[in-house]
Every structure is written in structure tokens, then in C-alpha cells.
From Swiss-Prot:
Organism domain of life: Bacteria
Protein name per UniProt: GTPase Der
InterPro entries per record: G_ENGA, GTP-bd, GTPase_Der, KH_dom-like, KH_dom-like_a/b, P-loop_NTPase, Small_GTP-bd
Entry's family note: Belongs to the TRAFAC class TrmE-Era-EngA-EngB-Septin-like GTPase superfamily. EngA (Der) GTPase family.
Gene name per UniProt: der
Length: 435
């Protein structure tokens, strides 16, 4: 589903990142501490009183050597492009500066709600001065302290009130998928090729932001929704070529997808940014397919495909479950396989298994490889049950969860995978003590 997006905007040194981290707090969802997964703090999940949303720290998007005013202008434009609600941060001790007024003028043009937060309002004397900020023209200023957490409740109440109302439309029964990857891996060409291959385009549906377009189509009698095709296709703004902006855009697409297609460039191999966006898809628990694009451009021998597969398995060890497809947007090579594979991964992502069969598999696994012991005490597994889908999540009841070593948990996971076919989806095992 698409979550409301809140962008934090303001000139340098007003405390944007401090406020961002304070609101995110421990609500950032990290499924597991996976080696090789890099987290990017410019985009985060957050929640207030049961309402979940996403936050962007525009100050975290580095514009390189651009002049100061150009940087804050671009950051404000990102907020206007990407957000449903904008939080404009100023500094109480410093008062209104020329840079604040520059940002304000840009935000006036936004057809988006703007909430004014006066940061560093740490004491009553400073808070009394916030009324000067009415002159910026954004209504009531909210005094806050990112460092001490003061005033955040009132600020977040105001933010949540501005979220778009849910329209009550019928639940989307299509499979939602996105193509993610760094610039120049060929996402735009893949989008055009996939939508041009005898597909029935149903409609372009505007998302929660001005330029996020989802494209619906039908293939093999299955309904699909390609998420954020506009975000992949659009070009022209300076910041759209920055790595951190493209990572942020990928994170948003992942959040709104059932299945994620991680696109690699066969000519360039695997880069750190490839790992970053793939790692976020894994942590978000989405179904994943790895696409190696521009496969037609490589000179090949009998070992080329196998060598590239092995490289992917080494560099993306945490994605051992993800199928790999070598494709070419230019020639159409293997693109006809994608709808069927996306559907298969989506089905696996939502698969439920019977408890009786699950426990037979677990007990057979234990007979094959007995549970570990420590100081004469052996781990005892009593039973397992599935508690969630998307991704499939299982609770294993044991005598002592601390005795479940990572390697044995991985063994049980592999046995469950092998029996039930969970290709393309992560699965989670949670150990609990039986009371």
C-alpha cells in the first residue's frame, strides 16, 4: 500500500536530521542484522498514534559542490515533488534568516500542506519568540526540540491531520511490482519493453504524490500494477541523478510493491548501490527477482552465465532465495518469462501451509540433523505454526530460544523452503519459549 510521505525541509543547521531521527526513533523496521546490507537514513518508516507514514530528510540528499542557495532550493523542490505533507524547520534562537525566506518562497508554490516547526525551542524564553515566525505565512508555528523531544506530539498531530483521506476504493487485486536499481541499469528501457509487448494497458493511476504514476496492465490473464513508472521514466532535474535521491525513490517504490525486480547492468557488474537498494527490499520483506539487463551486450563463452550467477550469489548472500533472470530490454530476450515469474513469486510471498504438514517437515529435519546441545542441555523443538504471510512467518516453540543457533535456524529455514517452494520470498522464523 502507498503510505503518506512527510518531507523535512529547512536550511542547514536548523536540526533537520536530529528531528528526523527523533521521530523515527526505534520505529525503523529492521528485520535482521544482515551482513552486506547498508541502511540509508534519509528515508524512514515512522508511526504516530497508529498511523504509519514515511519520512524524507531532504538535507541528507547531498548536492555535491552546488552553491548553498541552489542546494536548499533543490531540497525544497524534492519535498514539493515527493511529499504529501511538508515540515518546514526553522531555528528559534536564530530567528528568521534570508535563507528561511528563500525556502518559504519556494514552498508557497507547493500545492501541499506546510507545517512550520520552530526547532531548538528548549526553554520558555525561547518559546515566547516563536510568534515572530507567523510572518513566514504558514499559520501556527509549532515549538519543538529535536534534541529533547519536546513538542513533537503536537507537531505530529498537525502532520497526521493533513494526510490525504483514504478514498474507500475497492481493494486492488492486482500484483504490484517495481523495478529498482541505480541509474543507467536500463530500468526505463525495461519498463517500455515490458509495457510494449502485447500488453493491455488498463490505466495510469496517480499515486499519493503529484508525479507518482502506477501503470496497470494484464498479461497471461493476470492483473499487474507496475509501481512508479513516472519516477523511472522522468528525467531533467539535477537532483534526480544523485545516488541518494535514486535510493530514496527506490525505497518508496519498494514500500508500495508486493514483488521487487532488482535490476543489474551486465556491462558494469555489481556496485555498492545495487547492494543498498536490494538490501532494503530484503529487509522490507518483499518478494524479489534479480534481473541482469543488457545481457545481449556481453561476449560469452560456456562459463559466462554460470560465473555471473555465482558472483551474484556471493555479493547478495542474503538473497539466496531470489531467482535470477538474464534479460535484454533491447532485444526482448527472456522478457516473456517475467509475468509468470512475478506471479509465482507473489503467490509464494502470500503462501500459507498447513500446520500438520509444517510440523512433519520440521520433525523430519530434526531427525536428519539433531538439535544442538549446550552443557548437557539440548534444544527441544515442540511444534511450529505459521503466523503471517507477505512474507511467510513461522513461530517455532522451543524449550529455550537462546539455544537456537543461527546456523541451525538457517538449516530449518532451508528445509521448510525446500519442501514448500518459497522461491523468491524471504521467510522468517521466530523462536518462542513454550509456557
Amino acid at each position: 500500500m502507498a503510505y503518506p510521505v512527510v518531507a523535512i525541509v529547512g536550511r542547514p543547521n536548523v536540526g533537520k536530521s536530529t528531528l528526523f531521527n527523533r521521530i523515527a526513533g526505534e520505529r525503523i523496521s529492521i528485520v535482521e542484522d544482515t551482513p552486506g546490507v547498508t541502511r540509508d537514513r534519509i528515508y524512514s518508516r515512522a508511526e504516530w498514534l497508529g498511523t504509519e507514514f514515511r519520512m524524507i530528510d531532504t538535507g541528507g540528499i547531498d548536492m555535491g559542490d552546488e552553491p548553498f542557495l541552489t542546494q536548499i532550493t533543490q531540497q525544497a523542490e524534492i519535498a514539493i515533488d515527493e511529499a504529501d505533507v511538508i515540515v518546514f524547520i526553522v531555528s528559534a534562537p536564530e530567528g528568521i534568516t534570508d535563507a528561511d525566506e528563500k525556502v518559504a518562497k519556494i514552498l508557497y508554490r507547493a500545492d501541499k500542506p506546510v507545517i512550520l516547526a520552530v526547532n531548538k525551542a528548549d526553554n520558555p524564553e525561547v518559546r515566547e519568540s516563536i510568534y515572530d515566525f507567523y510572518s513566514l505565512g504558514f499559520g501556527d508555528p509549532y515549538p519543538v526540540s529535536g534534541v529533547h523531544g519536546l513538542g513533537l506530539g503536537d507537531l505530529l498531530d498537525a502532520v497526521v491531520k493533513e494526510f490525504p483521506e483514504k478514498d474507500g476504493a475497492p481493494k486492488d487485486d492486482s500484483i504490484r511490482f517495481s523495478l529498482i536499481g541505480r541509474p543507467n541499469v536500463g530500468k526505463s528501457s525495461l519498463v517500455n519493453a515490458m509495457l510494449g509487448e502485447e500488453r493491455v494497458i488498463v490505466s495510469n493511476i496517480a499515486g499519493t504524490t503529484r508525479d507518482a504514476i502506477d501503470t496497470k496492465f494484464v498479461a497471461d490473464d493476470t492483473k499487474f500494477t507496475m509501481v512508479d513508472t513516472a519516477g523511472i521514466r522522468k528525467r531533467g532535474k539535477v537532483y534526480e541523478n544523485t545516488e541518494r535521491y535514486s535510493v530514496m525513490r527506490a525505497m518508496r517504490a519498494i514500500d508500495d510493491s508486493d514483488v521487487v525486480l532488482v535490476v543489474l547492468n551486465a556491462e558494469e557488474g555489481i556496485r555498492e548501490q545495487d547492494k543498498r537498494v536490494a538490501g532494503y527490499a530484503h529487509e522490507a520483506g518483499r518478494g524479489i527477482i534479480i534481473l541482469v539487463n543488457k545481457w545481449d551486450t556481453l561476449k560469452k563463452d560456456n562459463h559466462t552465465l554460470t560465473d555471473f550467477q555465482n558472483l551474484i550469489r556471493i555479493e547478495f548472500q542474503y538473497l539466496s532465495y531470489a531467482p535470477i533472470i538474464f534479460v535484454s530490454a533491447k532485444t526482448g530476450q527472456r522478457l516473456e518469462q517475467l509475468p509468470e515469474m512475478i506471479k509465482r513469486v507473489a503467490d509464494n510471498h502470500n503462501k500459507r501451509v498447513q500446520s500438520a504438514t509444517l510440523n512433519d517437515v520440521v520433525m523430519d529435519a530434526i531427525a536428519l540433523n539433531p538439535t544442538p546441545s549446550d552443557n548437557g542441555k539440548r534444544l527441544r523443538v515442540y511444534y511450529a505454526t505459521q503466523v503471517a504471510i507477505a512474507p511467510p512467518t513461522f513461530v517455532v516453540f522451543v524449550n529455550d530460544p537462546k539455544m537456537m543457533h543461527f546456523s541451525y535456524e538457517r538449516f530449518l529455514e532451508n528445509q521448510i523452503r525446500e519442501h514448500f517452494d518459497f522461491e523468491g520470498t524471504p521467510i522468517h522464523l521466530i523462536e518462542r519459549a513454550r509456557k
